[in-house]
């Protein structure tokens, strides 16, 4: 049994790849949507268990923002590291604990080939706005280079972007978490 998150769909699921009996749930599925991170109630309980209740707002501001199915989810890696830092120093400031934990070569490759429209959309996201895009939840690594529009599917399925509201069948409203 394994759970893979923050990656594109695995291609060629078969008995010959070692990935048979494979079940895929995407970020938009509501089944188990609260199981892929911490809910706000769980974050409150965690902070309370260490006497850190006064740090809820900063924790929410920094680490809440992911949407799985119908659930707003906190990033567990960031929350755990922040609580650990606060246990060592109650004046510790929130940080981006994900920095330099993954290779961003794929994102850099997309940005190099981005046209002006794509660059403008990236700037809108960085400015805190949202964009509306069609997303391929079934996109695999073998298909990535097929279109610059796959950038949005990659950023969404790997957690760099999250939903802003409920998606329609043809359109996802995306923002930076």
Region spans (language model):
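Phosphate-binding site recognition
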Residues: 1-177
């Amino acid at each position: 049994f394994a759970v893979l998150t923050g990656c594109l769909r695995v291609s060629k699921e078969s008995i010959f790849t070692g990935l048979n009996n494979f079940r895929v749930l995407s970020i938009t599925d509501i089944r188990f949507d609260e199981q892929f991170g911490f809910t706000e109630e769980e974050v409150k309980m965690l902070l309370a268990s260490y006497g850190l209740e006064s740090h809820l707002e900063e924790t929410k501001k920094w680490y809440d923002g992911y949407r799985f199915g119908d659930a707003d989810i906190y990033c567990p890696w960031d929350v755990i590291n922040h609580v650990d830092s606060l246990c060592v120093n109650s004046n510790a400031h929130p940080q981006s604990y994900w920095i330099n934990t993954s290779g961003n070569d794929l994102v850099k490759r997309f940005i190099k080939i981005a046209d002006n429209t794509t660059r403008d959309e990236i700037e809108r996201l960085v400015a805190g706005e949202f964009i509306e895009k069609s997303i391929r939840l079934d996109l695999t690594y073998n298909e990535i280079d097929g279109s610059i529009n796959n950038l949005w599917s990659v950023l969404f399925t790997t957690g760099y972007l999250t939903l802003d509201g409920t998606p329609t069948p043809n359109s996802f409203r995306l923002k930076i978490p």
